[in-house]
């Protein structure tokens, strides 16, 4: 068993659906977790597929909620966005960008390959100070309510196994292989250093 709590980050594009669903579930299980996005702005489904509603990362979830409520309560209730923003507001005030975080983590989960690439690139561009390893793991999770929940439970299962592990370094590869077989998904994994 690890001597200190596992420090986990979950990262998606906008820090609204996938990373926040995992944040919610991991937090309920008592894990030390933070969540982030990587894009320059938060993009939510708009009135048409090619017209997203765009917010700055400094916009709180409550401000987004109230704005969408005012714009089209029925649409954003029907597509689940108001529910998601309400959940998010109960977890933290607003979205955060990974590139602006200076905290260290043991494991960072990303929800799509482009986010994985951004996180790894960002970590590799930072000046190494402590040489503490961080495992970056990508599992592709579609940006839907159902897939976000399924992905969050898989992330939670991996975290719980790692929390019980004596040595992350020795056990992670084998654990990921078992989870790939169980979930029918393949994961990307690399180690970076702080």
Swiss-Prot record:
Keywords: Hydrolase, mRNA processing, Nucleus, Protein phosphatase. It catalyses: O-phospho-L-seryl-[protein] + H2O = L-seryl-[protein] + phosphate; O-phospho-L-threonyl-[protein] + H2O = L-threonyl-[protein] + phosphate. One of its GO terms (molecular function) is RNA polymerase II CTD heptapeptide repeat phosphatase activity. It is an enzyme of class 3 (hydrolase). Its EC number is 3.1.3.16. SUPFAM superfamilies: Phosphotyrosine protein phosphatases I. GO terms for cellular component: mRNA cleavage and polyadenylation specificity factor complex. It is found in: Nucleus. InterPro entries: Ptyr_pPase_sf, RNA_pol_II_suA. Belongs to the SSU72 phosphatase family. This is RNA polymerase II subunit A C-terminal domain phosphatase SSU72 like protein 3. The gene is SSU72L3.
């Amino acid at each position: 068993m690890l001597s200190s709590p596992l420090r986990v980050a979950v990262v998606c594009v906008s820090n609204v659906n996938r990373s926040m669903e995992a944040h919610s579930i991991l937090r309920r299980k008592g894990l030390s977790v933070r969540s982030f996005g990587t894009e320059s702005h938060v993009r939510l489904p708009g009135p048409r597929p090619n017209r997203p509603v765009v917010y700055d990362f400094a916009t709180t979830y409550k401000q987004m909620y109230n704005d969408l409520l005012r714009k089209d309560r029925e649409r954003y209730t029907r597509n689940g966005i108001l529910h998601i923003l309400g959940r998010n507001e109960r977890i933290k005030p607003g979205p955060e960008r990974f590139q602006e975080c200076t905290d260290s983590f043991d494991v960072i989960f990303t929800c799509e390959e482009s986010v994985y690439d951004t996180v790894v690139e960002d970590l590799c561009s930072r000046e190494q100070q402590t040489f503490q390893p961080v495992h970056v793991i990508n599992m592709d999770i579609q940006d839907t309510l159902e897939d976000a929940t399924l992905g969050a439970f898989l992330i939670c299962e991996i975290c719980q196994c790692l929390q019980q592990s004596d040595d992350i370094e020795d056990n992670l590869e084998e654990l990921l292989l078992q989870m790939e077989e169980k979930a029918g998904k393949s994961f990307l994994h690399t180690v970076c250093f702080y």
